[in-house]
Design a protein with these regions (language model features):
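A structural preference for short, pocket-lining loop segments at secondary-structure junctions
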Residues: 16-43, 61-72, 90, 94-98, ...
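Well-ordered beta-strand positions
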Residues: 19, 90, 129, 133-135, ...
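Positively charged, low-complexity/disordered segments
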Residues: 1-19
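CoA-thioester-processing core
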Residues: 58, 62-64, 72, 78-132, ...
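Terminal low-complexity tails and localization/encapsulation signals of metabolic enzymes
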Residues: 216-230
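C-terminal long alpha-helix characteristic of the crotonase
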Residues: 92-97, 139, 148-196, 204, ...
Protein backbone atom coordinates (compact mmCIF):
# COMPACT_ATOMS: atom_id res chain seq x y z
CA UNK A 1 0.00 0.00 0.00
CA UNK A 2 2.92 2.36 0.34
CA UNK A 3 2.78 2.96 -3.40
CA UNK A 4 0.52 5.63 -1.93
CA UNK A 5 3.32 7.13 0.14
CA UNK A 6 3.68 10.75 1.21
CA UNK A 7 5.25 11.69 -2.12
CA UNK A 8 2.53 10.02 -4.14
CA UNK A 9 -0.31 11.54 -2.13
CA UNK A 10 1.30 14.97 -2.34
CA UNK A 11 1.44 14.58 -6.12
CA UNK A 12 -2.21 13.46 -6.14
CA UNK A 13 -3.13 16.64 -4.27
CA UNK A 14 -1.82 18.66 -7.23
CA UNK A 15 -4.74 17.18 -9.17
CA UNK A 16 -7.20 19.07 -6.96
CA UNK A 17 -8.61 20.98 -9.94
CA UNK A 18 -10.04 17.69 -11.21
CA UNK A 19 -13.58 16.76 -10.21
CA UNK A 20 -13.20 13.07 -9.32
CA UNK A 21 -10.29 10.64 -9.12
CA UNK A 22 -10.63 6.96 -10.08
CA UNK A 23 -7.86 4.67 -8.84
CA UNK A 24 -7.21 1.05 -9.75
CA UNK A 25 -4.50 -1.59 -9.78
CA UNK A 26 -2.19 -2.25 -12.71
CA UNK A 27 -3.56 -5.40 -14.33
CA UNK A 28 -6.40 -7.69 -13.35
CA UNK A 29 -4.89 -9.85 -10.60
CA UNK A 30 -4.89 -7.45 -7.66
CA UNK A 31 -6.06 -3.98 -6.66
CA UNK A 32 -3.21 -3.19 -4.26
CA UNK A 33 -0.79 -5.63 -2.67
CA UNK A 34 -0.78 -5.74 1.11
CA UNK A 35 2.16 -4.83 3.31
CA UNK A 36 5.45 -6.74 3.12
CA UNK A 37 5.17 -9.54 5.72
CA UNK A 38 8.93 -10.04 5.72
CA UNK A 39 9.44 -6.40 6.59
CA UNK A 40 6.85 -6.54 9.37
CA UNK A 41 8.07 -9.81 10.88
CA UNK A 42 10.97 -8.22 12.78
CA UNK A 43 9.25 -5.08 14.07
CA UNK A 44 9.24 -4.17 17.75
CA UNK A 45 5.97 -2.97 19.35
CA UNK A 46 7.11 0.63 18.95
CA UNK A 47 8.12 0.08 15.33
CA UNK A 48 4.81 -1.69 14.68
CA UNK A 49 2.85 1.26 15.99
CA UNK A 50 4.92 3.65 13.87
CA UNK A 51 4.42 1.41 10.82
CA UNK A 52 0.66 1.51 11.34
CA UNK A 53 0.70 5.27 11.73
CA UNK A 54 2.65 5.65 8.50
CA UNK A 55 0.00 3.71 6.61
CA UNK A 56 -2.88 5.44 8.34
CA UNK A 57 -1.47 8.88 7.58
CA UNK A 58 -1.37 8.01 3.88
CA UNK A 59 -4.84 6.47 3.81
CA UNK A 60 -6.35 9.41 5.69
CA UNK A 61 -4.97 11.71 3.00
CA UNK A 62 -6.93 9.69 0.46
CA UNK A 63 -10.03 9.65 2.66
CA UNK A 64 -9.92 13.42 3.19
CA UNK A 65 -8.87 14.29 -0.38
CA UNK A 66 -11.09 17.24 -1.40
CA UNK A 67 -12.68 15.51 -4.38
CA UNK A 68 -14.42 12.12 -4.60
CA UNK A 69 -12.07 9.16 -4.97
CA UNK A 70 -13.43 6.07 -6.75
CA UNK A 71 -11.83 2.69 -6.08
CA UNK A 72 -12.09 0.36 -9.09
CA UNK A 73 -11.12 -2.94 -7.47
CA UNK A 74 -9.78 -5.66 -9.75
CA UNK A 75 -8.72 -8.99 -8.29
CA UNK A 76 -7.43 -9.34 -4.74
CA UNK A 77 -7.93 -6.58 -2.17
CA UNK A 78 -6.61 -8.18 1.00
CA UNK A 79 -5.22 -6.55 4.12
CA UNK A 80 -3.83 -3.16 3.16
CA UNK A 81 -5.45 -3.55 -0.26
CA UNK A 82 -8.89 -3.68 1.32
CA UNK A 83 -7.98 -0.89 3.72
CA UNK A 84 -7.02 1.51 0.93
CA UNK A 85 -10.19 0.52 -0.91
CA UNK A 86 -12.24 1.46 2.16
CA UNK A 87 -10.49 4.85 2.31
CA UNK A 88 -12.14 5.79 -0.99
CA UNK A 89 -15.53 7.47 -1.29
CA UNK A 90 -17.04 5.01 -3.73
CA UNK A 91 -16.07 1.41 -4.40
CA UNK A 92 -16.87 -0.65 -7.48
CA UNK A 93 -15.24 -3.93 -8.44
CA UNK A 94 -14.75 -6.57 -11.11
CA UNK A 95 -16.40 -9.96 -10.86
CA UNK A 96 -13.06 -11.56 -9.88
CA UNK A 97 -12.54 -9.29 -6.86
CA UNK A 98 -11.79 -10.83 -3.46
CA UNK A 99 -11.85 -8.86 -0.21
CA UNK A 100 -10.54 -9.75 3.22
CA UNK A 101 -8.47 -8.96 6.28
CA UNK A 102 -6.03 -11.85 6.89
CA UNK A 103 -4.05 -10.20 9.68
CA UNK A 104 -5.36 -12.24 12.65
CA UNK A 105 -3.90 -15.35 11.01
CA UNK A 106 -0.50 -13.64 11.10
CA UNK A 107 -0.74 -12.79 14.78
CA UNK A 108 -1.57 -9.10 14.32
CA UNK A 109 -4.57 -6.82 13.91
CA UNK A 110 -5.37 -4.87 10.75
CA UNK A 111 -3.12 -1.84 11.07
CA UNK A 112 -4.21 0.65 8.42
CA UNK A 113 -7.78 1.37 9.54
CA UNK A 114 -9.37 -2.00 8.79
CA UNK A 115 -10.94 -2.49 12.21
CA UNK A 116 -12.45 0.99 12.10
CA UNK A 117 -13.61 1.43 8.51
CA UNK A 118 -14.99 -2.05 7.84
CA UNK A 119 -17.31 -1.84 10.87
CA UNK A 120 -18.52 1.57 9.66
CA UNK A 121 -19.16 0.48 6.07
CA UNK A 122 -20.87 -2.89 6.65
CA UNK A 123 -22.73 -4.36 9.63
CA UNK A 124 -20.40 -4.43 12.65
CA UNK A 125 -21.18 -8.09 13.35
CA UNK A 126 -20.20 -9.11 9.83
CA UNK A 127 -17.08 -6.94 9.99
CA UNK A 128 -16.08 -8.74 13.17
CA UNK A 129 -16.69 -12.14 11.55
CA UNK A 130 -14.52 -11.25 8.55
CA UNK A 131 -11.71 -9.88 10.73
CA UNK A 132 -11.82 -12.55 13.46
CA UNK A 133 -12.13 -15.52 11.08
CA UNK A 134 -9.96 -14.05 8.28
CA UNK A 135 -12.48 -15.31 5.74
CA UNK A 136 -12.53 -13.66 2.33
CA UNK A 137 -15.65 -12.50 0.51
CA UNK A 138 -16.17 -12.40 -3.24
CA UNK A 139 -17.55 -9.61 -5.41
CA UNK A 140 -21.19 -10.71 -5.18
CA UNK A 141 -21.07 -10.86 -1.38
CA UNK A 142 -19.24 -7.53 -1.22
CA UNK A 143 -22.09 -5.90 -3.13
CA UNK A 144 -24.72 -7.69 -1.06
CA UNK A 145 -23.30 -6.32 2.20
CA UNK A 146 -22.57 -2.82 0.86
CA UNK A 147 -18.79 -2.94 0.69
CA UNK A 148 -19.00 -2.10 -3.04
CA UNK A 149 -21.74 -0.35 -5.01
CA UNK A 150 -21.59 -2.30 -8.26
CA UNK A 151 -19.91 -5.32 -9.85
CA UNK A 152 -18.68 -5.32 -13.46
CA UNK A 153 -16.82 -7.66 -15.75
CA UNK A 154 -13.07 -7.14 -15.79
CA UNK A 155 -13.25 -5.37 -19.15
CA UNK A 156 -16.11 -3.13 -18.03
CA UNK A 157 -14.56 -2.02 -14.74
CA UNK A 158 -12.29 0.86 -15.76
CA UNK A 159 -14.74 2.33 -18.31
CA UNK A 160 -17.41 2.21 -15.59
CA UNK A 161 -15.13 4.07 -13.16
CA UNK A 162 -14.37 6.71 -15.78
CA UNK A 163 -18.06 7.06 -16.63
CA UNK A 164 -18.93 7.59 -12.98
CA UNK A 165 -16.12 10.12 -12.56
CA UNK A 166 -17.38 12.02 -15.62
CA UNK A 167 -20.93 11.98 -14.26
CA UNK A 168 -19.71 13.50 -11.00
CA UNK A 169 -17.63 16.03 -12.95
CA UNK A 170 -20.74 17.43 -14.63
CA UNK A 171 -21.88 18.85 -11.31
CA UNK A 172 -20.56 21.89 -9.47
CA UNK A 173 -17.17 21.02 -7.92
CA UNK A 174 -17.71 23.45 -5.07
CA UNK A 175 -20.95 21.65 -4.19
CA UNK A 176 -19.58 18.12 -4.57
CA UNK A 177 -16.63 18.96 -2.31
CA UNK A 178 -18.95 20.48 0.28
CA UNK A 179 -21.13 17.36 0.13
CA UNK A 180 -18.10 15.14 0.76
CA UNK A 181 -17.02 17.28 3.70
CA UNK A 182 -20.53 17.29 5.17
CA UNK A 183 -20.92 13.51 4.91
CA UNK A 184 -17.45 12.64 6.21
CA UNK A 185 -17.55 15.05 9.14
CA UNK A 186 -21.17 14.32 9.96
CA UNK A 187 -20.65 10.58 10.27
CA UNK A 188 -18.50 11.15 13.36
CA UNK A 189 -20.93 13.53 15.07
CA UNK A 190 -24.29 13.31 16.87
CA UNK A 191 -27.15 14.23 14.53
CA UNK A 192 -27.75 17.69 16.02
CA UNK A 193 -24.10 18.63 15.50
CA UNK A 194 -23.95 17.01 12.07
CA UNK A 195 -26.93 19.06 10.89
CA UNK A 196 -25.07 22.24 11.87
CA UNK A 197 -22.12 21.13 9.71
CA UNK A 198 -24.50 20.68 6.78
CA UNK A 199 -26.18 24.05 7.36
CA UNK A 200 -22.84 25.87 7.32
CA UNK A 201 -21.66 24.12 4.16
CA UNK A 202 -25.05 24.68 2.52
CA UNK A 203 -24.78 28.38 3.29
CA UNK A 204 -21.20 28.55 2.03
CA UNK A 205 -22.34 27.62 -1.48
CA UNK A 206 -24.48 30.74 -1.96
CA UNK A 207 -23.16 33.70 -3.92
CA UNK A 208 -20.46 31.51 -5.42
CA UNK A 209 -19.97 31.39 -9.17
CA UNK A 210 -21.06 27.75 -9.32
CA UNK A 211 -24.30 28.36 -7.38
CA UNK A 212 -25.24 31.33 -9.53
CA UNK A 213 -24.31 29.47 -12.73
CA UNK A 214 -26.20 26.32 -11.75
CA UNK A 215 -29.40 28.09 -10.78
CA UNK A 216 -29.32 30.44 -13.77
CA UNK A 217 -28.94 27.45 -16.09
CA UNK A 218 -31.88 25.72 -14.40
CA UNK A 219 -34.14 28.78 -14.48
CA UNK A 220 -33.37 29.54 -18.13
CA UNK A 221 -33.46 25.85 -19.15
CA UNK A 222 -29.88 26.08 -20.40
CA UNK A 223 -28.17 22.68 -20.59
CA UNK A 224 -24.56 23.84 -20.75
CA UNK A 225 -23.02 24.93 -17.44
CA UNK A 226 -19.67 26.56 -16.79
CA UNK A 227 -18.68 25.40 -13.32
CA UNK A 228 -15.27 26.56 -12.10
CA UNK A 229 -15.11 25.49 -8.41
CA UNK A 230 -15.49 29.05 -7.18
Amino acid sequence: PFFFNDTATTEIYTLSLHDALPISGAGKKSFVAGADIGEMSTLTPEEGEAFGKKGNDVFRKIETFPIPVIAAVNGFALGGGNEICMSCDIRICSDNAIFGQPEAGLGITPGFGGTQRLARIIAPGLAKEIIYSTKNIDAAKAKEVGLVNEVYTQDELLPAAEKLANKIAKNAPIAVRACKKAINEGLDLPMDEAIVVEEKLFGSCFKTHDQIEGMEAFLTKRKEKNFINA
